[in-house]
Amino acid sequence: MNLLMALFIDASLSLILISIAFWLPQLNIYTEKAGPYECGFDPLSSARLPFSMKFFLVAITFLLFDLEIALLLPLPWAIQIPKLSAMMVTSFILISVLALGLMYEWMNKGLEWTE
């Protein structure tokens, strides 16, 4: 019985707080707060602004290298596994792929902002 009463009180209190949080901000709407914020850009202008392809390529390269670094993060805990040589070979291959990708991007001037 106490459990049912506690669940009922918790559910009703949660429902009251959620409804207050939903309805209270709608009482006084500020025009500046109601407008969208687009990272400092005017949201009323054209949405088809030219996009820098260099920025896109550098961003994709960053995401790929960041993913490979995320794969390397658990390696210190992998030292505790019995097959230490397999872990070392895997980490060496992963670091080699990372270094080769960085060299390829550097040689093809994929990391340059100016052309």
Swiss-Prot record:
Q: Does the keyword NAD apply?
A: yes
Recorded catalytic reaction(s): these are:
a ubiquinone + NADH + 5 H(+)(in) = a ubiquinol + NAD(+) + 4 H(+)(out)
Q: Where in the cell is it found?
A: Mitochondrion inner membrane
Give the membrane topology.
Answer: Multi-pass membrane protein
Q: Which domain of life is it from?
A: Eukaryota
EC number(s) in its UniProt entry? 7.1.1.2
Query: What PANTHER family does the annotation carry?
Result: NADH-UBIQUINONE OXIDOREDUCTASE CHAIN 3
Q: Tell me the function of this protein.
A: Core subunit of the mitochondrial membrane respiratory chain NADH dehydrogenase (Complex I) which catalyzes electron transfer from NADH through the respiratory chain, using ubiquinone as an electron acceptor. Essential for the catalytic activity of complex I.
Q: What protein name does the entry list? A: NADH-ubiquinone oxidoreductase chain 3
